[in-house]
Amino acid sequence: KFTNCVTFKNTADFFLNFNYLNFNNETILVKGARHFQFEEIVTALEEKTHETVLEINLNAISHNLNFYKSKLKATTKMMVMVKAFGYGSGGFEIAKLLEHHKVDYLGVAFADEGISLKNAGIILPIMVLNPETTSFSAIIQHHLEPEIYSLKGLNAFLEIAEKRKLKHFPIHIKLDTGMHRLGFEEEDLDELIATLKGNQFIAVKSILSHMATSDDLEQQDFAHAQLHLFEKLSAILMTELQIKPIRHILNTSGISNFPEAQYDMVRLGIGLYGVSNDPEEQKFLENVG
């Protein structure tokens, strides 16, 4: 006679109930005839031991979002980064919450992340930070907005835009003001302007850059030099192209350390998840996991 026993009609019946089984510090003997396919049970049990579940506190996410919103001018827009699928916290769930809180933009690292969000029903505009040229067609198809940071990328996108006869498709121009990672430099502006001027296939929705030392108050001179260069280069583009796009350069630490440089929009990233480089600011943030 067996105690604490659960039985199943067959292997398929076991799998129907598998998610309800809870094993903790157990030794499991799997034995049976080959035709029962018990090797599938072994595989499932092995995978189950490696599962990790991270519970996300959406109230904490909302709290942190509102904390950073409180630092902004009433006219400043907010883009929230959900790249890497919400830093591992569940991209769609976070995106729906942000949509509820009426943020203005979402940012993702790669096109497939944005496509997943669009397919799940997210209607917020989504900027793709690192689009590969091979993803441009998918970006257009799913109404994502690419960040363009090189003449090669711009020309590749324009070629597709012309073939598809697009009208004023939104793109985002990234300037390199000191990060030296991606972006148009001052010496590129003449060719950039010549390429964009009068082009009807695309529209510059925003001009952006990325601060290299916004979290290091000992590097304020470098940070201010970046801000000065961003102001200069973006003003040239706006004047020459006769446009008034959204401008943004501040990330999470920049929101706190350089409030005078909010421009039209800021980009909130890791701060949404309760992480700050400032110990004093950290006291006001809530842990989300």
Spell out what each predicted region is:
Residues 1, 34-35, 111-113, 131-134, ...:
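Short, polar loop motifs at secondary-structure junctions
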Residues 2-9, 49-51, 123-132, 145-149, ...:
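Short hydrophobic/aromatic-enriched beta-strand-loop microsegments
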Residues 28, 106-107, 126, 247, ...:
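Hydrophobic residues within beta-strands of alpha/beta enzymes
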Residues 70, 74-144, 148-157:
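N-terminal active-site wall of soluble small-molecule enzyme domains
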